[in-house]
């Protein structure tokens, strides 16, 4: 069922409209927990440590995605409410393209410097291979991760919050299934967990792309031009959400970095 974001809401209807987004956020926050459970169960503590060490790279990507998603959806929603539908769709298409381009740049940079990144994030030589393997395979799905973050907000803007919720739930279940399949059944190493996460991200990314390309609803892809003002406003609007996710990356980095005591005892 479709709901227009420009409709008049009662407190009850507003809660019903917002509830799928709330559940989506809860489900996405469980992704790392699922990966951690399967990695520790089938690969051991060293593999789990490696996944935690390189995860700030994923947090960085997620922070940028959420910044564009929340900030961009605010800009697009405002224009839809003002009746500027063509401008809203141009901004949506432009911001999606910018987000994907940034994710591709991050992917290329990580693939080129994965070893240095793993060491910078605190990897020891003992688990460096684990860190590099998880990081490389995880970052290959960076565009899908970016699109999942963007579509999560833009499905709500398009009046399809339930579709976004269904895709997020399916993605989470697929992540758990393929974690088990790759690690327990196929006997893969840590790259299996990264691929499972990537497959989960691909589901909402692919379905969302098909939807916004071919279903001409309230929001869909259209030809666009560069809009510097839209980009600036979206980054400003979404900066608080980006900082929150960057804080998670910094906390994770501080927990996994070697302490001065560790450095002194290793000499």
Regions found by a protein language model. Name each.
Residues 1-18, 208-249:
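Interhelical loop/hinge segments that connect adjacent transmembrane helices in multipass membrane
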Residues 11-30, 57, 61-64, 140, ...:
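Residue-level signal for short hydrophobic patches within transmembrane helices
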Residues 37, 107-112, 176, 180, ...:
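Membrane-embedded alpha-helical segments of multi-pass transporters/permeases
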Residues 39-59, 91, 126-130, 190-191, ...:
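Interfacial/gating helices of multi-pass transporter permease domains
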Residues 48-108, 145-164, 253, 257:
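Small-residue-rich hydrophobic transmembrane alpha-helices
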Residues 125-148:
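Alpha-helical transmembrane segments of multi-pass membrane proteins
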Residues 172-205:
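Membrane-interface helix-loop junctions in multi-pass transport and translocation proteins
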Residues 255-267:
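Single conserved hydrophobic/aromatic residue that forms the stacking wall/gate
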């Amino acid at each position: 069922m479709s709901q227009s974001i420009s409709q008049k809401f009662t407190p009850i209807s507003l809660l019903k409209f917002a509830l799928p987004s709330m559940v989506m956020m809860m489900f996405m926050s469980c992704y790392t927990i699922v990966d951690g459970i399967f990695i520790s169960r089938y690969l051991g503590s060293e593999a789990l440590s490696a996944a935690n060490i390189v995860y700030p790279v994923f947090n960085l990507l997620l922070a940028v995605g959420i910044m564009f998603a929340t900030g961009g959806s605010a800009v697009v929603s405002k224009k839809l409410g003002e009746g500027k539908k063509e401008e809203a769709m141009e901004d949506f298409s432009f911001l999606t393209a910018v987000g994907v381009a940034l994710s591709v740049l991050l992917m290329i940079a990580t693939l080129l410097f994965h070893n240095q990144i793993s060491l910078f994030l605190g990897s020891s030589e003992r688990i460096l291979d684990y860190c590099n393997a998880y990081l490389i395979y995880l970052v290959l799905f960076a565009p899908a991760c970016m699109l999942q973050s963007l579509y999560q907000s833009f499905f709500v803007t398009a009046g399809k919050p339930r579709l976004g919720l269904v895709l997020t739930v399916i993605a989470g279940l697929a992540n758990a299934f393929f974690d088990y399949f790759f690690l327990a059944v196929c006997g893969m190493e840590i790259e299996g967990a990264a691929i499972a996460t990537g497959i989960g991200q691909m589901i909402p990314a692919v379905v969302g792309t098909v939807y916004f390309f071919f279903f001409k609803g309230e929001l869909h892809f259209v030809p666009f031009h560069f809009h510097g003002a839209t980009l600036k406003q979206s980054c400003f609007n979404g900066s608080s959400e980006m900082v929150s996710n960057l804080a998670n990356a910094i906390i994770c980095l501080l927990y996994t970095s070697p302490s001065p005591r560790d450095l002194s005892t290793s000499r």
